[in-house]
């Protein structure tokens, strides 16, 4: 695991601020995951597409659903990115 060094004249205060900021960012990302997942599920139900099949590239793309499916694919990509960021944040450790 890599180490990131922060230099400050107020280490205790900086440590506290960093912990608060990381916690706040984790909560925001967690909420974003919930909202984005709900939106993806809503679009999947509307288009009657299986999310696993869509992710695997196996779902048909009827022309009349093209825009909805593009939106759904965008939501799934966004969900993946948000989940990746959240996983990274959850591995961060602030050392004394």
Locate each region found by the language model.
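Short hydrophobic/aromatic segments of transmembrane alpha-helices and their interfaces
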Residues: 10-11, 37, 52
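Alpha-helix initiation/capping motif
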Residues: 10-11, 28, 62, 66
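Amphipathic alpha-helical coiled-coil segments
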Residues: 22-36, 40-43, 72-75, 79-82, ...
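Short E/K-rich amphipathic alpha-helical oligomerization segments
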Residues: 41-63
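Short, glycine/alanine-rich amphipathic alpha-helical segment
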Residues: 56-77
């Amino acid at each position: 695991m890599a180490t990131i060094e922060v230099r400050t004249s107020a280490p205790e205060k900086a440590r506290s601020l960093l912990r608060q900021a990381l916690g706040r960012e984790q909560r925001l990302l967690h909420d974003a995951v919930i909202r984005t997942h709900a939106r993806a599920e809503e679009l999947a139900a509307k288009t009657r597409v299986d999310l696993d099949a869509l992710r695997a590239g196996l779902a048909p793309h009827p022309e009349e659903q093209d825009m909805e499916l593009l939106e759904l694919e965008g939501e799934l990509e966004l969900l993946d990115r948000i989940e990746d960021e959240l996983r990274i944040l959850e591995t961060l450790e602030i050392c004394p």
